[in-house]
From Swiss-Prot:
The active site is at E341 (proton acceptor), Y429 (proton donor). This is Leucine aminopeptidase 2. The lineage of its organism: Eukaryota, Fungi, Dikarya, Ascomycota, Saccharomycotina. PANTHER family: LEUKOTRIENE A-4 HYDROLASE. It is found in: Cytoplasm; Nucleus. It comes from the Eukaryota. Present with 5590 molecules/cell in log phase SD medium. One of its GO terms (biological process) is lipid metabolic process. Inhibited by 3-(4-benzyloxyphenyl)-2-(R)-amino-1-propanethiol (thioamine) and N-hydroxy-N-(2-(S)-amino-3-(4-benzyloxyphenyl)propyl)-5-carboxypen-tanamide (hydroxamic acid). The aminopeptidase activity is stimulated by LTA(4). It comes from Saccharomyces cerevisiae (strain ATCC 204508 / S288c) (Baker's yeast). One of its GO terms (cellular component) is cytosol.
Amino acid sequence: MFLLPFVIRHSSSIYLPTLRFRGLLTVISRNIHISTPHKMLPLSIEQRRPSRSPEYDQSTLSNYKDFAVLHTDLNLSVSFEKSAISGSVTFQLKKLHEGKNKSDELHLDTSYLDVQEVHIDGSKADFQIEQRKEPLGSRLVINNASCNDNFTLNIQFRTTDKCTALQWLNSKQTKGGKPYVFSQLEAIHARSLFPCFDTPSVKSTFTASIESPLPVVFSGIRIEDTSKDTNIYRFEQKVPIPAYLIGIASGDLSSAPIGPRSTVYTEPFRLKDCQWEFENDVEKFIQTAEKIIFEYEWGTYDILVNVDSYPYGGMESPNMTFATPTLIAHDRSNIDVIAHELAHSWSGNLVTNCSWNHFWLNEGWTVYLERRIIGAIHGEPTRHFSALIGWSDLQNSIDSMKDPERFSTLVQNLNDNTDPDDAFSTVPYEKGFNLLFHLETILGGKAEFDPFIRHYFKKFAKKSLDTFQFLDTLYEFYPEKKEILDSVDWETWLYKPGMPPRPHFITALADNVYQLADKWVEMAQHLKTTEDFRSEFNAIDIKDFNSNQLVLFLETLTQNGHSNKKPKDFDWAKFPVASRALLDIYQDNIVKSQNAEVVFKMFKFQIFAKLQEEYKHLADWLGTVGRMKFVRPGYRLLNSVDRRLALATFDKFKDTYHPICKALVKQDLGL
């Protein structure tokens, strides 16, 4: 139990009438700030506490601790002919007088940038670009930063053909026949777009002026321009954000409303489909999230549906979520991805991990909030069902890791110059979610946990933090439940590799799925002909399954069923009649599906069943998608059964993939 000493400082708000009688200490703790001594955590975890919080980010070459960024202004020009963005960035800086060099030098991150000139308070300044240090780039060193505590830094630059922040597509590579460019800056690629303090620990407000022959979207609110120059697009971001959240795209973009504060942008040929896919749900998601946390702070919430090569499901660029076209399933079955990106408006964008070691604070919280949103709308069993799907994805992710001992821990250690992209996996998402779900459960359920959610996001709004700041806040908020919190095996949850302790999930929406999958595994070993299977199974079996249930069904089949009695040596490749019968009987819901999640799981089942006639279909499909969730495991699957086809397919399509995706697939294939 948490005891004195403590210092009491009154809060600006008192909520005594709404509190149940839980003891004076509880009342006090919820409504005043308690300044507690450190080392309140269990000793085993206290021993891991860093010397300072937030922990220093080792994935930057900048001296960001020596300066505060008061504002950032981007003045950019997009050239499709040169596949380059040029222009300038202007920082309003303040010296913090920390560190041994007392800010005599200013260090910024760059990567494959052509830095042309540097000016401080209008005067030209000397600078050097240090030798490249993989994978962190090249440090930009500016001497004699300024004799003033507050000063303006202007840097002129141009991106190069080695830029990892942008993907350029010529007119032949887009379905609309116009060139296109989009950015992807997370985790450490902002430094390849413009010189910056490329760390999530540094936030600033932004303005941007972007010249392009084609429409532009940006991670901010469009400022109406009264000038006659229609090729210049101006934006403002009033909420401080880190550099990695900047998002820029330019191409043949059209727009349509999808809610009172939301617009969808995409190429004209898919605009109507995108509008239909999103218009029923986006505002509902926003209002539901506001009830769980607090008011949406960013004003507008817009969505850019990107080109096919976009590598992620979505990117939470503030005001302008970047989304994959694989969300367009023509039945609104993938809309929950938008709930995830929307949830980032609080977790990740408003409250941010201080370094990529603590990425779970972004993504674990976001998955938790995403599932709270869909649970509030569709019911608690739906939330638990989504968690079951996530648990399976987590197991698959860890099983496929080349170094699970290192990369399956919740808190990472990237302090040896490891590229954060190399550590990217489902772990921070699903392991992080399961920790928060476990805390919700042991602390008394949603009614007990929701006040902490609001407190946490208000306390760290517009700030960056590490795991220990999260833990300290948790313990401070629940002083009367210290014994419960101490019972958590923090060492296992945060620092041990592998799967976490499994929470209890409601399986109501999964039970029928498991039963049908088990029946197929059982019957595959006994029935001999297609007619036999048609007499036992019917398309009506899955008629009422939603897309997530279909995904779980196919995934459970590849795991040889769910039953405790499932055969250990079962192999679908030994039962080709059963495999083909299943796909034939359920073809309307599975084979003909336009939902990319279902389609991918179908291909996975076909590979497990070694249906060789289907390998080419998977290879062709890999040329139509760019989302790494499908591309990377797709190539691994194909490589496991036909390496020659996998290599030929990658060679054919590699230049259509985003640079990050291309590099990671090369690693996966051992190239």
